[in-house]
Structures are given as C-alpha cells and as structure tokens.
Amino acid sequence: LKREKSLPLLRAWNAVLIGIFFSFLPQPLLSDSGTPLRITAVQFQVRREYYSSPAAFTAAADELVRKAIREFDPHLIVFPEYTSAFLSLTDVADQLDESVSVEEGIEILRDSGVSIKNLHQFFYEKGGETARLIDAVWGGLAEKYQVYIVGGTYFHAEEKGTVKNSAEAAGEEAAARSRGSLYNRLAVYGPGGDRIYEQDKVYLTEFETELLSLEPGKPEQSSGLPIGETRVVFTICRDTFFDDWDIRHRGADVWIDLKANGAEYNGETRKSFARALPVRIAESKVPQGITVCLVGGFLDLFWEGRSSFLRYAPGNPKVVRKSRTWDRGELLHITLEASPCFPLEDR
C-alpha cells in the first residue's frame, strides 16, 4: 500500500528531474511554428588594434556578439564586407602606421624582412591560415552563443594547379595569379560551429582587381540559405547595383547587402546607396532588406556608410530604420515581419 502511494510522488519527482536535465540542453534556435527571424546588423568600425593578433580580433568580435545578444537576443548576427579580410595581417599589423598608403605599407614590410612581392601573393600565401582562423573565430562564437553569424568577407585563396613554366608568365603579378586565385568571400556559420554557406563577390572594384588581383564569383552560386523558415539571400557591396539577382533572389524573405563604401559619405554617396538595395528590393519584390556597412580605416583606406533596414512597398521601398552615424560602430536590430508584405503569389 505504501508503495502504491509513493508511485505518483516518484513519477512527479522524475518529471521534475527530467525537466531540469533538458533545461540545460541547447534549445532550438528557431521553432517550427514560424517564429519571426531576429537579425542584428553590426556596423563594424575597423581599428588597427583589432588586427594586431588573433586574440585581439577574437576579443573584439566576442564583445560585439555578446552585446548584440544582451540587447536584442538575435537569431542572426551580420558583419559587413571586409570585416575578416585584414586577419591576414595579424603578424605585421603593428608595423603599419595608419597614415601610410598601401604601397608604402608594402615597402615597410619588405624593409622589415617580410617576403612580399605584391598584395595578391601576400594574401594568397596567407589564405589557408586565414581561413582556419576565421572558422575558429566565427564558428567558435556561433557555437558558444548558439546563433547564426555572417562573419563579413575575407580574401579566400584557391589553388589553380602547378605552373609548368612560370617564365612564360608576363611579370610577377601574372605568375602569382597563375598559381592561385583570390576571391572576396562571405561565410555564414551555424550554431553548431560549422561554416554552412559561402558566396563570392561578382562585380569587383578597381581596388580589388588592380591592387589585389581578385577574381569574380558566379551569380549562379548565390542561392542563399534557409534559417528556420526564413530564406536569406546576399549580395556583396558593388554586386547590389546589378540586376543579375532580381529573378534569382525573388521569393526570398530577406535580402542582406554586405557593404564597404570606400568613399566619403556625402550627398552623391547617399544617391549611390539609393540605387543599390532599394532598387533591388523594388525589382525583386523581396519583402525586406538590410544594408550593413563597414566604417573606420586601415592604412590610408577608409570606409563610411549608414546601415539600414528596408521594407518593400510598391514603387519605392521604405527605410524603416537606419544607423545614427556613418563613421562609427553601431548595432542595428530588426525582427522580420512574420508574414510577407504582399501575397506570396505576387512575388
């Protein structure tokens, strides 16, 4: 009789223990019930000291991710173009004064004993090490905080194969390019810590083609990815001015533009921004868009721009939120609308 009376109590106690056990397990990032995706855009301010060592960059990134989670509890955190690109310089950043030009920086490194013929060769030879570092930083943070992270872009190196007769190459630059390719690549990390998506910039700038000898990606490799029930698609800076993605991205739920505007943010630049993602949103009818900007400077390079969130409206997408500044770091947050701004069949 005593045993029979103790069974309900035992079952209740077991239920409590099971509940406590499962409360310590990682919870699903998004439910299956159509939870609106929460996104924080990091208007990242470049500082030379961030790239002085892997530990310094990791600490800076960790602080920003923690701040985003503390203030907004996002599912997805997005960093802009070039955020990870200068991680290739962690061994030499302290030797480079912020006021010198890129060309002067190369000479300083040569004088200090660094073997560097040109920027393409330097970033290509650092490519494997940089990719591993990026995966460790962003993959580690995504797993640590159980979020999705777009770690900006970096210069991705791919081997082309052995050059049989490098003497036939016309100069050092051509020889370097014949050995391997560099791409401006974005990478997305999931809460498991793995890289789950990547995409290369297609329409390169003069800086990227002439100084870095980057090669373009392909629009057909820009499919985006699902996060929960939300299809997220991307373009990288200058790509957003071109209509290649209007049909390709149609049907997505949110379009994210990773931008590094290397010019003063003045009236003309504002008009340029208006010809980028707002036009793509209007043409593709993607219901929501995000532009996330790099700001700050490194060597004689500088970047300015205002990050913003857009919502589709016939004829002219509406800016629903934008950063307060164009030259300082900020966090900008939005919760995507749970339902499209118009019937799905109209897209």
Model-derived segments and spans:
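N-terminal secretory signal peptides that target proteins for export/translocation
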Residues: 1-10
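Bacterial N-terminal signal peptides
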Residues: 15-24
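Active-site-proximal beta-strand elements of phosphoester/diester hydrolases
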Residues: 36-54, 198-201, 229-239, 256
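Cys-nucleophile CN-hydrolase/nitrilase-fold catalytic domain and related Cys-dependent amidase chemistry
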Residues: 66-189, 267-276
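Short hydrophobic alpha-helix segments
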Residues: 80, 197-199, 320-324
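CN hydrolase (nitrilase-like) catalytic-core segments centered on the catalytic cysteine
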Residues: 133-150, 240-332
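Active-site catalytic loop in hydrolytic enzyme cores
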Residues: 136, 140, 155-250, 267-275, ...
